A protein has these predicted regions:
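Short, small-residue-enriched loops and turns at beta-alpha junctions
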Residues: 40-43, 70-74, 101-103, 158-159, ...
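Conserved N-terminal subdomain of the carbohydrate kinase-like
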Residues: 1-62, 230-250
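Structural motif
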Residues: 62-63, 149
């Protein structure tokens, strides 16, 4: 797929097989079950080679995305090591992971994090976060950690984008969902594209929500369609709020 799309690649060979994740859809109850495999054991020389290759190809001004879970054998501070490389190269580092890898990666320094409410709760050391608590807890996190932008995913309700100066609530329209596979990744991809095009953070977060929402309108592992993305982005741009202080109502 990458070759067909003329996307340059740098592959780091490993001894094990690439992992597979399986999604099963119950068409009767409209429920989807996902089975995420842990993946092969990654040897020390393999993950170290990945860091070496990354350091060799990054240049100032790049946008770097690290996403997904770590395979067995990889240290939980792997994304923290990536963060140090990104800082040395002066690139925008976007991290989208969970658990201990998220905690260690976020504390080392990132440009943007895209947690959901549960992941944000983990980052902030609390059990749960309600909508009413979201703004104050997220702003406290930004104040105490080396992170410039938080985009908190709210699923079908959209997202909240926070910086030290502002809070933006991005509404998502109600659509006919066929599958949520790849919605989060599509959201990140949309934000990266907007950043690469020089768009503002507000435009970035709206376009990300548009891509994530559009991905739910396609079946199985199909990607979002550009026509859907553009139509959704127009709607979102007309129905979102930007302010210095915004109240999020339940």
């Amino acid at each position: 797929m990458l070759v067909d799309s003329s996307i340059p690649q740098l592959v780091v060979p490993i001894e094990g097989w690439v992992r597979e994740n399986i999604a099963v859809t119950d068409t009767k109850n409209k429920e989807q079950y996902r089975f995420g495999m842990p993946g092969p054991m990654i040897k020390e020389q393999e993950w170290k080679k990945t860091l070496e290759q990354l350091e060799a190809v990054l240049i100032e001004g790049d946008i770097l995305v690290a996403s997904g879970s770590l395979c067995p054998g990889m240290p939980t501070d792997f994304f923290a090591s990536v963060s140090k490389i990104a800082g040395d190269k002066n690139v925008k580092y976007i991290l989208d992971t969970s658990g201990e890898a998220l905690l260690k990666g976020a504390r080392t320094g990132v440009y943007l994090l895209k947690p959901n409410l549960g992941e944000l709760a983990t980052l902030c050391g609390v059990k749960t976060i309600s909508f009413l608590e979201l703004e104050s807890i997220a702003q406290t996190f930004l104040k105490n950690n080396p992170c410039e932008v938080l985009v908190v995913s709210l699923g079908p309700q959209g997202a909240v984008m926070l910086t030290a100066q502002s809070v933006d609530y991005i509404s998502a329209p109600i659509v006919c969902q066929k599958s949520t596979i790849g919605a989060g990744d599509s959201m990140v991809a949309g934000m990266v594209l907007a950043l690469a095009q020089g768009k503002s953070l507000q435009e970035m977060s709206k376009y990300g929500v548009a891509c994530g929402t559009a991905a739910t309108m396609t079946s199985g592992t199909q990607l979002c369609k550009r026509k859907d993305v553009e139509e959704l982005n127009d709607w979102i741009s007309s129905n979102s709020s930007t302010s210095q202080k915004i109240k999020i109502n339940v």
